[in-house]
Curated annotation (Swiss-Prot):
Disulfide bond positions: none
Protein name: HTH-type transcriptional repressor PurR
HAMAP family xref list: HTH_type_PurR
Domain notes: Consists of two structural and functional domains: an N-terminal DNA-binding domain, approximately the first 60 residues, and a larger C-terminal domain, approximately 280 residues, which imparts the function of corepressor binding and oligomerization.
Alphabetical UniProt keywords: DNA-binding, Purine biosynthesis, Repressor, Transcription, Transcription regulation
Alphabetized InterPro entries for the sequence: HTH_LacI (IPR000843), LacI/GalR-like_sensor (IPR046335), Lambda_DNA-bd_dom_sf (IPR010982), Peripla_BP_I (IPR028082), Tscrpt_reg_HTH_PurR (IPR023588)
Residues annotated for hypoxanthine binding in this entry: 73, 188, 219, 273
CDD domains registered for this protein in UniProt: HTH_LacI, PBP1_PurR
Location of the DNA-binding region in this protein: 4-23, 48-56
HTH lacI-type domain residues: 2-56
Amino acid sequence: MATIKDVAKLAGVSTTTVSHVINKTRFVAEETSKTVWNAVQKLNYSPSAVARSLKINTTKSIGMIITTSEAPYFAEIVLAVEEHCYQQGYSLFLCNTQNEPEKIQNHLDMLIKKRVDGILVMCSEYTRNSLELFNATNIPMVVMDWGKAHEKNDRIIDNSFNGAYLATRHLIDNGHKDIGVISGYLTKTICSERLEGFIKAMKEANLPIREEWILEGDFEPESGFEQMNNLLRLDKLPTAIFCFSDTIALGVLSALSEKGIAVPQDISIIGYDNTHSSRFFSPPLTTIHQSKSRLGVKALNLLLERIKLGHKEYQPHTIEFHPELVLRHSVRNLNKSEE
């Protein structure tokens, strides 16, 4: 395997000159530079990435720790981050944790050994232990938190309350008075805020809120499927269901399809997140849009800013998003039915 000394000997220059040409750290005459590159190609010389990173104090790599990249919501954020990393000349190490402290610790250790320039942390929830692990490292880091503000964490404000209010108002405006909910874990801030938005819209319209129609899932299709079947066992069904995620709605649609119940003819469904696949559901899902790509890009830009600052003190940032209603074909207008 060729070394930098071999390149220097063939090009008739010093190893220092070869280093400056390859790393572009100093001006080198065009003719000399061309001679060096010809020698590099002839010898098939490949500089050691580790050696270069030690010399210029950067590996041009980013670590990303997330709950799971399988969930459509996180998958779309990861895609945006990876694409933006590529555009900025960075490689991305992706680490799934399933919110397990041991995995978080192991992934952190691995990223530190890889000498990544920075770490982007984006989990659906944090334990005190995981936050302590993140805060203990000196690597530039952006910790995105959907929950209450923490001293060192950057916060995402997705206005879940407003999004849920918007979704519920859409159902009410389409003549629905009996509305059910299938949520994620209500201990999570985003879910409790969405439930509050639902309740506000219902109370403003003087509509009854039936506790047996408020069911708790876990954001996965399986829980949507299971809770929809639980609803179907009741004597009276709602005319519409507000699902707190598109993945929950997918499970709900599957359960209804198995029972031969048509959407939206027999029951209306509205989702949340506007994941890429929601437009291909049967029927295409009316939902609440959140810009996952914009979130990913903003979070990465924030991290790149931290990397430039080095160890200087910085203030936590807030990234705020405003939900929008996306109209498709899963909600029936009952007002037209009565005309």
